[in-house]
């Protein structure tokens, strides 16, 4: 699959996870509704589904990975930043085929696209500290 299709899968995953985090609806329902309502012809849909289910299933674990590196309480974190960080931490911890730098760079780009003005700096700061702990032998 082309890198652009993976990038689009991550973009869609941020949007769907944002919806899931706010609604607390079943992740399968969120996925179904998202795919029914969005144009996903240029999206790696399998990867989108993996990100959604992987983040939803492992959200407590992923939150635990980020907590030591947050400058505020998890509950105070914006929903977009939380979704972006969860995706990146899922890729770093569960998808060894995704290069370390790709996971971080994609998260920064997602934060620039969907987050508040300086959220990409915050996301970069958290991942810059967390990534070497999650993947100690990778750079």
Swiss-Prot record:
GO biological process: DNA-templated transcription termination; transcription antitermination
GO cellular component, one term: cytosol
GO molecular function, one term: RNA binding
Transmembrane segments: none
Pfam families: NusB (PF01029)
Keywords from the UniProt entry: RNA-binding, Transcription, Transcription antitermination, Transcription regulation
Function in brief: Involved in transcription antitermination. Required for transcription of ribosomal RNA (rRNA) genes. Binds specifically to the boxA antiterminator sequence of the ribosomal RNA (rrn) operons.
Family stated for the protein in its record: Belongs to the NusB family.
Protein name per Swiss-Prot or TrEMBL: Transcription antitermination protein NusB
Species this chain originates from: Salmonella typhi
């Amino acid at each position: 699959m082309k890198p652009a299709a993976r990038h689009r899968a991550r973009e869609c995953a941020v949007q769907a996870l944002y919806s899931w985090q706010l609604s607390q609806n079943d992740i399968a329902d969120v996925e179904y509704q998202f795919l029914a309502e969005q144009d996903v012809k240029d999206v790696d849909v399998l990867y989108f589904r993996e990100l959604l289910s992987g983040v939803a299933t492992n959200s407590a674990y992923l939150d635990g990975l980020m907590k030591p590196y947050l400058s505020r309480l998890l509950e105070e974190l914006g929903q977009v930043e939380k979704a972006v960080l969860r995706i990146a931490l899922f890729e770093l911890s569960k998808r060894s085929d995704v290069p370390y730098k790709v996971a971080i760079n994609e998260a920064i780009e997602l934060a620039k696209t969907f987050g508040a003005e300086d959220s990409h700096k915050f996301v970069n700061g958290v991942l810059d500290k967390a990534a070497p702990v999650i993947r100690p032998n990778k750079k």
